[in-house]
Amino acid sequence: MNYLGGFFMKNLLSMEDLTNEEILSLVKRALELKKRAENKKRNDLFVANLFFENSTRTKKSFEVAEKKLNLNVVDFEVSTSSVQKGETLYDTCKTLEMIGINMLVIRHSENEYYKQLENLKIPIINGGDGSGEHPSQCLLDIMTIYETYGKFDGLNIIIVGDIKNSRVARSNKKALTRLGAKVTFVAPEIWKDESLGEFVNFDDVIDKVDICMLLRVQHERHTDSKEKREFSKENYHKSFGLTEERYKRLKEGAIIMHPAPVNRDVEIADSLVESEKSRIFEQMRNGMFMRQAILEYIIEKNKL
């Protein structure tokens, strides 16, 4: 929970903003929405989606979720906005607030960008901040896991890939550990962040995990020339990708996850993206329902 603009307001900026009870409540609400559509009249509420980084799934599923909730979605394109004239993020958001926008969904390349928005008087949903956090992705991942297993206690989860630059890894580690799962990481040495937890050898644990979560290599965040120089698709797939050989070692009942976009034959063999154990496209489907639940939650908590 956050204090912004000098008064109490409920935002969703980090997984730390949610209690375990709130996480489970959101999961159950999203599953309800998945089973049956509801259309409450909210024609008087306006939402703007500000995406300063490229996005397909997060942006479009928020848009669909907003329209399913009968919200008025205001089109905002960074490329045609006054951001191109040097306007600050705060001034852009304050302008939208002053013309009647009721809430914002924001993705930005800067970690914790929302700290500069403390004087806003409308709620913010974080659509991803740099390599910081991605709460809505984490919540849809939690929903997908709960839908499969009905629990978190005792689950063994590995997150594999570019951990150092991944907001998904950070959000999932925080929330899933709190919910009772064991989360460990697999990564090339150059993309490790030891502060997040334990790193293990992929081949030592592949046959013991319940969930194998694969991450995209985040080329756009690689500023070190060594990172770029050492990366090879073939070598990465051989050492850190889910190959067909590793897939065969997964135990019965194990599932594969990936926040997408997927680099086929890099993080995962092309033939496995829609395999029996894969939940990758189901995650995308669940994303829209979870984002509906998040929007409802923010509307209700802020009495909009």
UniProtKB/Swiss-Prot annotation:
The keyword Transferase applies. L-aspartate binds at K85, R167, R216. GO terms for biological process: 'de novo' pyrimidine nucleobase biosynthetic process; 'de novo' UMP biosynthetic process; amino acid metabolic process. Carbamoyl phosphate binds at R57, T58, R107, H134, Q137, A260, P261. It catalyses: carbamoyl phosphate + L-aspartate = N-carbamoyl-L-aspartate + phosphate + H(+). One of its GO terms (molecular function) is aspartate carbamoyltransferase activity. Its EC number is 2.1.3.2. SUPFAM superfamilies: Aspartate/ornithine carbamoyltransferase (SSF53671). Keywords: Pyrimidine biosynthesis, Transferase. InterPro entries: Asp/Orn_carbamoyltranf_P-bd, Asp/Orn_carbamoylTrfase, Asp/Orn_carbamoylTrfase_sf, Asp_carbamoyltransf, Asp_carbamoyltransf_Asp/Orn-bd. Pathway: Pyrimidine metabolism; UMP biosynthesis via de novo pathway; (S)-dihydroorotate from bicarbonate: step 2/3. Catalyzes the condensation of carbamoyl phosphate and aspartate to form carbamoyl aspartate and inorganic phosphate, the committed step in the de novo pyrimidine nucleotide biosynthesis pathway. Belongs to the aspartate/ornithine carbamoyltransferase superfamily. ATCase family. Heterododecamer (2C3:3R2) of six catalytic PyrB chains organized as two trimers (C3), and six regulatory PyrI chains organized as three dimers (R2). This is Aspartate carbamoyltransferase catalytic subunit. The gene is pyrB.
